[in-house]
Amino acid sequence: MSKILIVNSVYYTEIANLLLEGATDKFKGNNIGYEIIKAPGTFEIPAAILFAVKGKNTNYDGYLALGCVIRGETDHYKYVCKGVIEGLNAIVMHHAIPLGMGIITADSKDKALIRADKNKKNVGGHAASTVLHMIDLHNKLK
């Protein structure tokens, strides 16, 4: 059985809960073990995953990043999005780990809620499917 580390940003609690529900439903349906840790914001997700990758007492088959960044009135949105995507990409490229990225970037909370809801866009569920696919691919190519 595969074991996944889910790093869930809790900055937008309602969205975080929806993302997590979509992801864990996918894992339960596939008999996948998982552990959940909370990051204070989406920007902190890459660091949390790197802590686990470099940790001596962790043994995960894959990683799932769940979070949301909503556009505001300043450039903060642009820099957070760029930092998160580049941070996750660097970890994947340097450590060759299976990762699913369920990071919602949206212009409004309403749009983010639609993307997070498992009965609508289900970003969390799709990201969970991605990490499972990447674990299979990783195992085939090792």
UniProtKB/Swiss-Prot annotation:
Binding-site list for (2S)-2-hydroxy-3-oxobutyl phosphate: E73, T74, R115
Reaction catalysed by this enzyme: (2S)-2-hydroxy-3-oxobutyl phosphate + 5-amino-6-(D-ribitylamino)uracil = 6,7-dimethyl-8-(1-D-ribityl)lumazine + phosphate + 2 H2O + H(+)
EC numbers, comma separated: 2.5.1.78
Pathway(s) it belongs to: Cofactor biosynthesis; riboflavin biosynthesis; riboflavin from 2-hydroxy-3-oxobutyl phosphate and 5-amino-6-(D-ribitylamino)uracil: step 1/2
Family: Belongs to the DMRL synthase family.
Keyword Transferase attributed: yes
UniProt name for this protein: 6,7-dimethyl-8-ribityllumazine synthase
Originating species: Wolbachia pipientis subsp. Culex pipiens (strain wPip)
Function of the protein: Catalyzes the formation of 6,7-dimethyl-8-ribityllumazine by condensation of 5-amino-6-(D-ribitylamino)uracil with 3,4-dihydroxy-2-butanone 4-phosphate. This is the penultimate step in the biosynthesis of riboflavin.
GO cellular component terms given for this protein: cytosol; riboflavin synthase complex
Domain of life, source organism: Bacteria
A molecular function (GO) term: 6,7-dimethyl-8-ribityllumazine synthase activity
Keywords for the protein's UniProt record, in alphabetical order: Riboflavin biosynthesis, Transferase
Active-site residue list: H76
Binding residues for 5-amino-6-(D-ribitylamino)uracil: Y11, T42, F43, E44, C68, V69, I70, M101
Biological process (GO), any one: riboflavin biosynthetic process
Iron-sulfur is among the record's keywords: no
